[in-house]
């Protein structure tokens, strides 16, 4: 379990870094020659994070039903406190 949590933590940090670069350089730009776009990097990092989340569920570290409920709760908060769900 320790290895799984360590890698989960690392992937969270990599998503944070990818988001920062999207904001800094623009989502469809690359920040170095030969690198893909920030969007491509963000997509990869989110995929890596989702893999680790799925493993946490599969290994019983968290329950899928509890994660699903947390998602619904977050969506409800976003509808109140953000513009993300507004037309």
What are these language model-derived features?
Residues 1-46, 50-87:
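Flexible "arm" and connector segments at domain edges
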């Amino acid at each position: 379990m320790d290895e799984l949590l360590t890698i989960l933590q690392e992937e969270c940090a990599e998503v944070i870094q990818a988001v920062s670069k999207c904001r800094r350089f623009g989502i469809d730009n690359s920040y170095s020659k030969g690198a893909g776009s920030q969007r491509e990097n963000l997509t990869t990092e989110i995929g890596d994070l989702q893999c680790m989340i799925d493993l946490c569920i599969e290994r019983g570290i968290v329950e899928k039903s509890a994660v699903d409920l947390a998602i619904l709760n977050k969506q409800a908060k976003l509808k109140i406190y953000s513009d993300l769900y507004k037309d």
